[in-house]
Amino acid sequence: MAGRDRDPLVVGRVVGDVLDPFVRTTNLRVSFGNRNVSNGCELKPSMVTHQPRVEVGGNEMRTFYTLVMVDPDAPSPSDPNLREYLHWLVTDIPGTTGASFGQEVMCYESPRPSMGIHRFVFVLFQQLGRQTVYAPGWRQNFNTRDFAELYNLGPPVAAVYFNCQREAGSGGRRMYP
């Protein structure tokens, strides 16, 4: 496959760290305010405090989707021992609508990276039908691949990620001369 090495999901190691290779078959649009998320773009923590608007493509409302948002770099990219950290989980999103029409299983938790540049990944799966998904007991050490297998979701149909790092002035120790 010729373009595989230029796929931003491969270059950004989302494919590998979070997902296996897949073919995008559905449109997924994520935006925070007026900023659309594109693969590898950088957003500041102050821009992502509120739940994003998520629009799902598809052909009809009788097809349902599951959206997962994870941080594979928690607590730090050099030692991601909490990989993956689950920030948001929404199921039963009807095709052609958005996440606000789905069932929120885990509420949105805004990214607050403390060290290094973190990737925040949105993954969309097509469901076989409406189904009951149980909230994981905790957010840390979530595994998108295992989750998809547990609920028989198959490969992802879309994914997008952004980078985010701590903003200057958002806490931490200050040194004064």
Swiss-Prot record:
InterPro entries from the UniProt entry: PEBP, PEBP-like_sf, PEBP_euk, Phosphatidylethanolamine-bd_CS
Function: Involved in the regulation of vernalization and of flowering time; this process in essential for flowering in cv. Bd29-1 but seems do not occur in cv. Bd21.
Matching PROSITE patterns: PBP
One Pfam family per UniProt: PBP
Name this polypeptide is given: Protein VERNALIZATION 3
Organism encoding this protein: Brachypodium distachyon (Purple false brome)
Family: Belongs to the phosphatidylethanolamine-binding protein family.
Taxonomic lineage: Eukaryota, Viridiplantae, Streptophyta, Embryophyta, Tracheophyta
Tissue: Expressed in leaves but not in shoot apex.
UniProt induction comment: Follows a circadian rhythm expression with a maximum transient peak four hours before dawn in long-day (LD) conditions, but barely expressed in short-day (SD) conditions. Targeted for mRNA cleavage by Pooideae-specific microRNAs miR5200a and miR5200b in leaves in short days, but not in long days. In cv. Bd21, accumulates progressively in the shoot apical meristem (SAM) before vernalization but stable levels during vernalization. In cv. Bd29-1 low expression before vernalization but expressed gradually during vernalization to reach a peak after 8 weeks.
Biological processes annotated in GO: inflorescence development; positive regulation of vernalization response; regulation of flower development; regulation of photoperiodism, flowering; regulation of timing of transition from vegetative to reproductive phase; vegetative to reproductive phase transition of meristem; vernalization response
Recorded superkingdom: Eukaryota
